[in-house]
């Protein structure tokens, strides 16, 4: 009997039984879309976490339409605590994670992109931070590239002008504004309250996620993390960057490049669409911090 449980449709019962961790404290959710090998490596990294005995792992396949499900079922069959959930269609980043949240049982949720590999103590350190301070709603780790360079893991809330300047020749004209937006003048080795952290790897309290109704599904890809952190601050909880927890990021930002390069790529056009939705949603609203 397979050890991995697959939900072929979210509203149906599991196809086969699995062996859940009793009363997990942390639910780690991995969202896969056509990168099953990365998802497997991510699960393997999660299984090495120092608090794995208090964690459950859910892998959501976002209707990849390739061999992802077969690869995941085969490669993860040795991990009886892992659940695989298959969406009936590609519902996007936020909605995909929301489905995982729906089935998660932990007090804390670790949102983990397959490209992010948490180091041995990462989950434990994020958990310890949040257990000690009830005012923290979301915590994000320091992200490192494979070459040892630090990836920007947090930024200030953007304005329309910030996004335009960053994508055009105007960037060199307004270096101080870009430094404020990109937070490049801050020390990545110091913990601090930040406007928002990268959604590819963060821990959020389950009760807060439920109060906020998870990610806003109108953002198919990009800006859902900014929106979530903004609502976290508005709900009276803090967003904290915590570099004592570290994760390796195997990919560069999907949304890098100027306006022209964004328009030429589907992922770039998705970024623009989400930006329009974000600024429309928050138009006229005061920053929550």
Language-model segments: residues:
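A short, conserved alpha-helix in the catalytic core of glycosyltransferases
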Residues: 187, 195-213, 218-246
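Short aromatic/hydrophobic "clamp" motif used to bind/position activated sugar donors
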Residues: 109
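Active-site-adjacent helix/loop segment of glycosyltransferases
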Residues: 9, 29, 226-289
């Amino acid at each position: 009997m397979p050890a991995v449980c697959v939900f072929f449709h979210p509203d149906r019962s599991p196809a086969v039984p699995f062996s859940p961790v009793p009363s997990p404290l942390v639910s780690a959710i991995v969202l896969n879309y056509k990168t099953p090998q990365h998802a497997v490596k991510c699960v393997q990294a999660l299984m090495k976490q120092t608090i794995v005995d208090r964690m459950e792992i859910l892998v959501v396949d976002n209707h990849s339409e390739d061999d992802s499900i077969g690869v995941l079922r085969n490669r993860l069959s040795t991990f009886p605590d892992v659940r695989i959930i298959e969406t009936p269609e590609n519902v996007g980043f936020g909605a995909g994670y929301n489905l995982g949240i729906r089935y998660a049982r932990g007090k804390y949720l670790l949102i983990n992109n397959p490209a992010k590999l948490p180091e041995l103590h990462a989950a434990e350190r994020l958990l310890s931070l949040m257990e000690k301070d009830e005012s923290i709603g979301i915590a994000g780790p320091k992200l490192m590239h494979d070459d040892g360079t630090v990836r920007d893991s947090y930024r200030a809330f953007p304005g329309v002008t910030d996004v335009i300047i960053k994508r055009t020749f105007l960037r060199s004209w307004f270096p101080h504004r870009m430094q404020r937006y990109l937070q490049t003048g801050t020390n990545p080795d110091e913990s601090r309250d930040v406007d928002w952290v990268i959604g590819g790897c963060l821990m959020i309290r389950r009760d807060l996620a439920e109060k906020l109704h998870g990610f806003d599904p109108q953002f198919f890809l990009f800006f859902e993390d900014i929106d979530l952190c903004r609502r976290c601050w508005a709900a009276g909880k803090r967003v904290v960057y915590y570099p004592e927890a570290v994760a390796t990021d195997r990919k560069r930002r999907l949304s890098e490049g100027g306006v022209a390069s964004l328009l030429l790529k589907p992922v770039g056009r998705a970024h623009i669409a989400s930006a329009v939705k974000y600024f429309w949603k928050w138009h006229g609203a005061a920053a929550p911090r």
